[in-house]
Structure formats: C-alpha cells, structure tokens
C-alpha cells in the first residue's frame, strides 16, 4: 500500500515554505555589536587569522561541517536524464538526510554544464568552501571519470554515493547473507543486471570483500557483457566474459546471488527457482524491484530477498551509509574516503544486524520484533545505533590508513559525543520546523 498520494508528495514540497531546506544562523544578529562581529569590522580578525594559517578555516567558519551535494541531473533515481532543475528536489532531500542522521550541513548544487571537463572544473573551484563533495545522480561513464579526476585533484573527500553507498550497504547485506546461508564469500557466484554506476561499483566492492572476479556475470540492456560483443564501452570490459554464456535465464541457473539495479519485472519466478539452494536476491530497481518480494518468496521460500523499499524486509538504502561516512570523514579531516573506510562501514553495519533491536526501532516499522535472520540481514535505516556503529569504525580505518589529518584517540567517547550532537541538532530543528506548520 502506498504511504502517500502524488498530490501529498507535491504539497509536501510546496507548503508551507517552498522546498525542504533553509539556511539558518548559528550566531545572534540583534545588536550593533552583533552586527559588527558578524561582518565588518569584526570579521576581519577571522580573515586575517585564516590568511596566516589556512587550517584555521575549519575553526572560524562552517567549512569543516559543510558538504556539497552536486549533480548534473543526468541519472536521477529511476527517472533518468531529467536535467539539473528537475534534479533539485532530490539534492535537497539528500541534504535533509545528511542533517537529520548525522548533523552534516549541505548546500545542494545542480550544475548546468556542457561537458565532463566543465563539470570537473566547476567542482574544483569549490574546494575552499566545502569540507567534502557528494556527487549524485550522474550517468555512467562520466561519473567514473568525474570522481576519479576530482579525487586525484582535490584535497577533500569526494564520494559518488550512487556508486559507493549502494555498494557498501549491499555489501553489508552480502556478508550476512553468506553467513546465514553457510556460504564462503570467495565461492559465491553473482549475476549483476545493470552495468551503470551502482552495478559496476557493487561488483568491484564485492571483489574487495572477497568475491572472485571470475564469479561475476554482468548484464546491461543489451544482454551479457562479453568480449565478443561489438561497440562495448571500455569500462564494461572489467567484468566482461570471454564468451557469450547465454541469456539472463541461462546465467541465473545455479547462481548464488542476483543483484538487480535495472528495471522492474525483469526476473521471473522460473529464474528464481533455477538458482542455487538458499538463493540471495538483491532486487533494487527503483521504485519497483526486478521481481516482487511476494513472487520471489513464492518461488523459493528459502531465499533471502532484499530491495530498496521500506515496505519489504531487508531494505538496502544508502541512507544507512553516506551520512555517517561523511560525518567521520569530516571529523578526522580525511583527504579521501578510501576502500578501507568503505569496508569498515560495511563490516560494522553487518555486525550491528546481529545485536538485539531496540523497541523504538521496531515501533518505527510497526513490528513487534526484529531478529537476525533471512528477513533481517541488515539494520533498518531508522535505527539510531547506526550512527555510533559506523562512525568509529570508519574513523579508525581512516587513521590506520593514513588519510586522516586529525586523530581521535577515544573512539568510544567520540561515539557518545555524536549521540549528544545529533540529539541536540534534532532538538533545535524540531521547534524550527514546527514554526512553519
């Protein structure tokens, strides 16, 4: 059952104030002295201090807690290339999630650029303003070029969430699915449908977790990716088979894991029936999965099924990752978000699923209980414990791999401080939002 109607969604974005975000002050501006401190002449003292020591920009401005969510609107959710104007509601929504879950401030920037080079050049000029860059909804292969170039040429974290967020959360789900079904990850066979940003990143990340590259068969809109196909995009060669191994139905036979990042109703019940014992399906087409939860379970009651939807078990949602990963990347002043940090996030999230679930989380999802098993392989996105689970693990990985410019010695204390920080943020925001109602 739908949680809302189309008109309710439009009204939510329209009223009582247009959009979902607003810039608010953190300092008073009510007296002559306030005004003089906020701007001229008092602001000059902060400017001079930063001019003498650039690192002080993190102390005297909000840069260290400010992330740019940047898109060109070429690959938006399940909507495709709708352009930068139509992409803006998504980018504002991303800002809401950053702030709500991890108290990270966001400016959303939808760019109207004519080329990959223009996009890269525009983002590079923003480094003095932001502590991190979240790339969003950019089509492949441009997204790979953009991220790789910006990571090399900027001194702040650059993270394409459509790639790595999906990979990290589904990677956590994969770790637990292997454990629950008695599989060794190095033996898992995988069929990936969707060779865009998310599909490629997931396949790469699964390899980092232990899946053998030769065990992955990848499909795009034209079928199996293999080296005898003509006009194959260069980036797809990474997972190309030597020969044409047949159709999706052929390749699904006996496979352990299906990963779908494509379109609805692509997978039949017969395909699911042909999979290995205790098959795992991550059907994440948006908004409707490649096969419904009901159809998959009817075909194979022994399957583990995950989707991107909140109304089915095992929701694989990027919001369980990116706010917290950026939170600690900012706090340790990381120069990048590297592979070790991503793996640490996935492992921490997987471990949390095995812990008893608080009543408040069960209540949020209208269930009596949640227990580690086939229908609960990954924590629910609204679980507040994710904050204190992921952030210390990722911070430690950043420090251990030498990308942190600032050390956090007491990680347990850091986790407790984050709890207080996010609660205080919620306490400030709640009456502010209510003032518009």
Question: Model-flagged regions — what are they?
Answer:
Residues 161-162, 181-183, 285-407:
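Adenosine-phosphate binding glycine-rich loop
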Residues 77, 82-102, 160, 164, ...:
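Glycine-rich phosphate/diphosphate-binding loop of Rossmann-like nucleotide-binding domains
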Residues 134-137, 158-161, 257-312:
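ADP-ribose/adenylate-binding Rossmann-like module
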Residues 127, 185, 251-252, 272-275:
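A short, aliphatic-rich alpha-helical micro-motif
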Residues 72-74, 82, 111-112, 137-140, ...:
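Short, ordered loop/turn segments at secondary-structure junctions
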Residues 28, 32, 39, 43, ...:
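Generic structural signal for well-ordered, non-membrane alpha-helical segments
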Residues 1-158, 396-405, 421-437:
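N-terminal ligand-binding/catalytic initiation module
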């Amino acid at each position: 059952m739908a949680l809302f109607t189309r008109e309710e969604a439009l009204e939510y974005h329209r009223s009582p104030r247009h959009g979902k975000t607003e810039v608010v002050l953190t300092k008073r501006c009510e007296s002559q002295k306030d005004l003089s401190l906020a701007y001229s002449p008092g602001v000059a003292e902060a400017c001079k201090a930063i001019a003498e020591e650039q690192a002080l920009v993190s102390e005297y401005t909000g840069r260290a807690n400010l992330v740019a969510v940047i898109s060109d609107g070429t690959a938006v959710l399940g909507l495709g290339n709708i352009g930068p104007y139509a992409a803006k509601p998504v980018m504002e929504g991303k800002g809401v999630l950053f702030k709500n879950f991890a108290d990270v401030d966001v400016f959303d920037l939808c760019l109207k650029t004519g080329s990959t080079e223009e996009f890269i050049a525009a983002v590079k000029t923003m480094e003095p303003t932001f502590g991190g860059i979240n790339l969003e909804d950019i089509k492949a292969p441009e997204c790979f070029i953009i991220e790789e170039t910006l990571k090399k040429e900027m001194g702040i974290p650059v993270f394409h969430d459509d790639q790595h967020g999906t990979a990290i959360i589904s990677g956590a789900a994969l770790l637990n699915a292997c454990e629950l079904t008695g599989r060794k990850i190095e033996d898992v066979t995988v069929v990936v449908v969707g060779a865009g940003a998310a599909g490629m990143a997931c396949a790469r990340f699964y390899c980092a977790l232990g899946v053998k590259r030769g065990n992955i068969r990848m499909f795009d809109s034209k079928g199996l990716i293999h080296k005898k196909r003509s006009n194959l995009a260069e980036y797809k060669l990474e997972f190309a088979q030597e020969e044409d191994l047949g159709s999706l139905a052929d390749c699904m036979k006996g496979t352990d894991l299906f990963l779908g990042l494509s379109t609805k109703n692509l997978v039949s019940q017969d395909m699911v029936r042909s999979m290995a014992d205790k098959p795992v399906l991550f059907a994440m087409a948006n908004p409707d999965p490649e096969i419904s939860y009901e159809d998959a379970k009817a075909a194979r009651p022994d399957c583990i099924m995950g989707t991107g939807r909140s109304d089915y078990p095992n929701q694989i949602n990027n919001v369980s990752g990116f706010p917290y990963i950026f939170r600690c990347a900012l706090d340790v002043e990381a120069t990048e978000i590297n592979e070790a940090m991503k793996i640490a996030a996935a492992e921490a999230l997987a471990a949390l699923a095995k812990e008893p679930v608080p009543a408040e989380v069960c209540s949020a999802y209208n269930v009596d209980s949640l227990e580690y098993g086939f229908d609960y392989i990954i924590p629910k996105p609204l679980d507040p414990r994710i904050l204190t689970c992921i952030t210390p693990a990722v911070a430690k990985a950043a420090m251990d791999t030498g990308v942190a410019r600032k050390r956090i010695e007491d990680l347990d204390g850091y986790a407790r401080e984050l709890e207080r920080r996010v609660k205080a943020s919620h306490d400030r925001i709640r009456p502010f939002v209510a003032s518009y109602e």
